[in-house]
Structure formats: structure tokens, C-alpha cells
């Protein structure tokens, strides 16, 4: 998580886990400026280092961003100019500009239960403009339970409510959305396997 930025931890990730077949992504990393005492420079350094690790290992990066769209966009663009890397914007609630920037460098956008919230109209309008072949669905458990389970402790089984809502938003069947997002998952997380 962006608010945890320990250099020693990153070295451990790089040296110990990247070659493990069960290690399928780098992150969650990124920028989180929600808290007043956010150490922005340390977060930026850590985020860039994680992108470098992701690029070198060819593992996707899971990007967390909160109240940091401009810096996230700048880092993603600058780092993509240094070389391609794969990844997704986790629990997307950001601006249309961030969605466009992420999509322009080939990242995926992951949608959580927030999309079902009554006050998420702006988010829904942004998500409608994201190509289906770039969308994933997530829970962000134990937080952000989708309607009709809002207020309860979130769990992976609740992702079906978010997926159903998203399918309706795109005017497709839940079955079709499930097929698309499953394909997207395996296209992004190439080390993942149905066998395990």
C-alpha cells in the first residue's frame, strides 16, 4: 500500500518473490494523499521503484491512487516513456483524465462496489467510456461492499453484485461480462492459472 514505503521491503520483493510462480503481480502500490501526513516524495520514489521492478520482471503492477490523480498521471506517463509495463488501476474512483492516461499506456481499470453507490454517478459516466476489454471487477474486501450489501463487511462472493451492476451499465448480460472480465484477468495476470 502506498502509505507503507520501506526500501528494505522492496528489495525483499525483488530478490525473493518475483520468480515464485504464485507471485503474479507487483503491488498494491501508487500514491495516496488522503492523509495529512502523507510522505509524498517517499510515495513517489516507492511507486517508481515498483514500476521499475514490474517492468524488469514483466509482472503487472497494481496501482492504488487516492487524491493524487495529477501525480499518478505524470508518473505513469513518464515511466511509460522509459519502457512498457503492464498493470491496472485498482479500485478505480479517479478522474476521466486518469482513466484516459492509464488506458493510453495499456493499463486496465478495475471496478469495485463503489460503482453501485447512489452518489457514484460521475464514476459511472467515466466507466461507461472505458472499453470492456480493459475492465476488471474486484471487491477490495473487506471494504466497499456493493449495494444491496453496503455497510456489511465485504467479501469476495459479493463481486457478483458489482459485476451484475456493471453488466447492466454496459447493457450486456452478466454471462458476457463474466467472460470478458475473466479473459481480461488472464491477459493481464499471465502467470495466473485456473489449475491452481
Per-segment meaning from a language model:
Residues 31, 143, 187:
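Active-site micro-motifs of SAM-dependent methyltransferase domains
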Residues 12, 25, 88, 108-110, ...:
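Conserved beta-strand segments that form the floor/walls of ligand-binding pockets within enzyme
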Residues 1-13:
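Single conserved hydrophobic/aromatic residue that forms the stacking wall/gate
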Residues 70-71, 118-119, 183:
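Short secondary-structure capping/turn micro-motifs that flank functional sites
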Residues 105-172:
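Glycine-rich, positively charged active-site loop/lid region within alpha/beta enzyme cores that binds
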Residues 16-105, 125-126, 130, 148-157, ...:
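Divalent metal-binding pocket/active-site signature
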Amino acid at each position: 500500500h502506498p502509505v507503507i514505503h520501506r526500501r528494505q521491503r522492496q528489495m525483499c520483493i525483488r530478490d525473493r518473490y518475483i520468480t515464485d510462480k504464485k507471485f503474479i503481480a507487483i503491488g498494491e502500490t501508487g500514491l495516496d494523499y488522503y492523509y495529512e501526513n502523507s510522505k509524498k516524495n517517499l510515495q513517489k520514489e516507492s511507486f517508481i521503484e515498483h514500476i521499475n521492478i514490474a517492468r524488469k520482471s514483466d509482472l503487472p503492477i497494481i496501482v492504488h491512487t487516492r487524491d493524487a490523480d495529477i501525480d499518478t498521471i505524470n508518473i505513469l506517463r513518464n515511466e511509460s516513456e522509459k519502457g512498457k509495463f503492464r498493470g491496472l488501476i485498482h479500485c478505480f474512483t479517479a478522474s476521466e483524465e486518469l482513466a484516459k492516461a492509464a488506458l493510453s499506456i495499456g493499463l486496465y481499470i478495475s471496478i469495485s462496489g463503489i460503482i453501485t453507490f447512489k452518489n457514484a454517478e460521475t464514476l459511472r459516466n467515466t466507466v461507461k467510456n472505458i472499453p470492456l476489454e480493459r475492465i476488471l471487477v474486484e471487491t477490495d474486501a473487506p471494504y466497499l461492499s456493493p449495494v444491496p450489501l453496503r455497510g456489511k463487511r465485504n467479501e469476495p462472493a459479493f463481486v457478483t453484485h458489482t459485476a451484475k451492476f456493471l453488466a447492466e451499465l454496459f447493457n450486456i448480460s452478466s454471462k458476457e461480462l463474466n467472460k470478458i472480465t475473466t479473459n481480461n484477468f488472464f491477459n493481464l495476470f499471465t502467470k495466473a492459472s485456473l489449475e491452481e
